[in-house]
Amino acid sequence: MKIEEVKSTTKTQRIASHSHVKGLGLDEAGNAKQSASGLVGQESAREACGIITELIRSKKMAGRAILLAGPPGTGKTALALAMAQELGNKVPFCPMVGSEVYSSEIKKTEVLMENFRRAIGLRIKETKEVYEGEVTELTPCETENPMGGYGKTISHVIIGLKTAKGTKQLKLDPSIYESLQKERVEVGDVIYIEANSGAVKRQGRCDTFATEFDLEAEEYVPLPKGDVHEKKEIIQDVTLHDLDVANARPQGGQDILSMMGQLMKPKKTEITDKLRGEINKVVNKYIDQGVAELVPGVLFIDEVHMLDIECFTYLHRALESSIAPIVVFASNRGNCLIRGTEDISSPHGIPLDLLDRVMIIRTMLYTPQEMKQIIKIRAQTEGLNISEEALSHLGEIGTKTTLRYAVQLLTPASLLARVQGREVVEKEHVEEINELFYDAKSSAKILQDQHTKFMK
């Protein structure tokens, strides 16, 4: 007899470099705790980010820019992700890297604008009238065919719906009868009909029929409790980019050209300013009517020094437009040349006139104690057992080299411990792995010492 174990098919979450970040780790007063929500240290930067998230929530921050500046490995990307976690999934957060704007198919400014629109949400409130209940009767009424002949057409459908509160008889359009047939609605089914669109949805068989033995595997649902006729408010969250794309590429035409267009590989096309202007008009009309509200989100541009002078000039205009999100830049450069210029150098690789418009948040280097805490959190996230000695040693390595290098030694050290049959990662495992691999500084030193042996 063969017995097989059924393995779970749920997707295992891969541990990324910022999986441990769960939020900014602030208390009720907005002060940073020393270590909370996966973040350690950087108290002043975290408090500043906390104030910005509050401003975003109260919608007073749109069209402003923030720059996270600091040396590599001081948690700039982690802070931006923590802000996204704090804001929740209702506020759009669009991360991008500075080098993403360079494409052979579309302009740099188009990529920037696309991401700008992705970071602006629109919350549309819609009131739907719904008839819901168990079908008690379903009678199509026929009339003579106006075209002549012996055939008859359906003029209307009489349907009876029952809920726990009462019953109602409805006279429906013949087009709804087709929907009822498609859904295979019978007496005893629980359905709901949208009054505005005439959409019909069969939810299942009423559970009063559950005792009847039937060969078909039916899904039994309870009798609806409210009234037959109800008004439901449905809230939809879309971004402006979704609206742009939906209108830029209309789906389904019957002519041969659109058929061919659907078969061919879709080329990335630019969305024109005219189309965006039209969509903005419609959005403004919705906002004036109170049907929708604008939710300015966050656009996070990492490695902002990779943008060139043209992109920066475009950012000026984009930041000052009426519909603009909050832009968070991150850069680990000091004074460097602005890309696309010959000899203009500037702090963080950003032109001075744009630096004038941004609020700068500094991130400081971590102390050995903070590094130790971060490595401990990473070990917990990756599910590794590590001794105190090994943690302290990794903290020292992180201080001499970089935090990233110290964190990268964790998994190989745990693998070595497992090969040796140990459950806990000890100091000697870390030392052995550290001897096998080089960090950037020691590798550069070897290059300097042996520069004659390497090719130029």
UniProtKB/Swiss-Prot annotation:
Residues where ATP binds: 70-77
A Pfam family it matches: TIP49
Residue segments, region Disordered: 1-20
Compartment(s) where it occurs, according to its Swiss-Prot or TrEMBL record: Nucleus; Dynein axonemal particle
InterPro entries tied to this protein: AAA+_ATPase, P-loop_NTPase, RuvB-like, RuvB-like_C, RuvBL1/2_DNA/RNA_bd_dom, TIP49_P-loop
EC number: 3.6.4.12
Reaction equation(s) it catalyzes: ATP + H2O = ADP + phosphate + H(+)
GO molecular function, one term: ATP binding
Key words, A-Z: ATP-binding, Cytoplasm, DNA damage, DNA recombination, DNA repair, Helicase, Hydrolase, Nucleotide-binding, Nucleus, Transcription, Transcription regulation
Swiss-Prot/TrEMBL GO biological process terms: axonemal dynein complex assembly; box C/D snoRNP assembly; chromatin remodeling; DNA recombination; DNA repair; epithelial cilium movement involved in extracellular fluid movement; heart development; positive regulation of DNA-templated transcription
Keyword Nucleotide-binding among UniProt keywords: yes
Principal EC category: hydrolase
Oligomeric form and interacting partners: Forms homohexameric rings. Can form a dodecamer with ruvbl2 made of two stacked hexameric rings. Is a component of the RNA polymerase II holoenzyme complex. Component of the chromatin-remodeling Ino80 complex. Component of some MLL1/MLL complex.
PANTHER family: RUVB-RELATED REPTIN AND PONTIN (PTHR11093)
Similarity-based family: Belongs to the RuvB family.
Name of the molecule in the record: RuvB-like 1
UniProt organism field: Danio rerio
